[in-house]
A protein has these predicted regions:
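Amphipathic alpha-helical interface segments
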Residues: 1-99, 122-186
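Histidine-centered, metal-coordinating catalytic motifs and their short helical/loop contexts
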Residues: 93-120
Length: 186
């Protein structure tokens, strides 16, 4: 696989992460409206699947150094990327490392395998989201000479990535609002 193909595959993982995060956030907004009937398991499973796929995709990009899509195997200037990432996230190295460990642990203990842990700590994905936006911006401004050619039809700029994410948030919210009954008040 050549470098251009690797950039494109990284962009595909980023898009998948953000789509699933958008669907998850829209799901959380309507969670209270899920009916207590035979469809409930479907909705709960759908929300959980979005979480799991988002975590899996993010781990490929940030948690597994051996993965061919991990930032350390893609970016040219390794010494500059991580400090810039940490600065963008507003985190120290230790806090970021703890966060990566928590996301990886959720993936390893509950998504990839069902280990014997009794408590499932589902990671918050706000930091993961900001990391993906940073990585995408880095690729489109520092690594890829022609992002439009490499990424199309995927977002090829930070502005396009933001629109892509917002579009999927709105699309999911619209879909949920169309199919779920309104919240009943007593």
């Amino acid at each position: 696989m050549n470098r251009t193909e690797r950039f494109r595959r990284v962009a595909l993982l980023m898009a998948s992460f953000l789509r699933n995060l958008a669907y998850l956030r829209a799901f959380k907004d309507v969670h209270a409206r899920i009916p207590m009937d035979w469809t409930r398991d479907f909705w709960i499973t759908q929300g959980g699947n979005c979480t799991d796929i988002a975590v899996l995709e993010w781990c490929k990009l940030f948690a597994d150094r051996a993965d061919k899509h991990h930032w350390s195997r893609i970016v040219a200037d390794l010494d500059a990327f991580k400090p810039s990432l940490l600065a963008r996230l507003g985190m120290e190295e230790a806090a970021y490392s703890d966060y990566v460990t928590s996301v990886r642990r959720y993936r390893d203990k509950f998504v990839a395998h069902l280990d014997s842990d009794n408590v499932m700590d589902i990671p918050m994905l706000d930091i993961a989201e900001r990391a993906v936006f940073f990585y995408h911006q880095h690729l489109t401004t520092q690594e890829v000479s022609d992002p439009l050619q490499v990424f199309r039809p995927l977002p090829s700029s930070s502005a396009e990535l933001t629109l892509y994410f917002e579009h999927h948030c709105r699309a999911a919210a619209h879909t949920y609002n169309e199919v779920l009954p309104p919240l009943r008040t007593i």
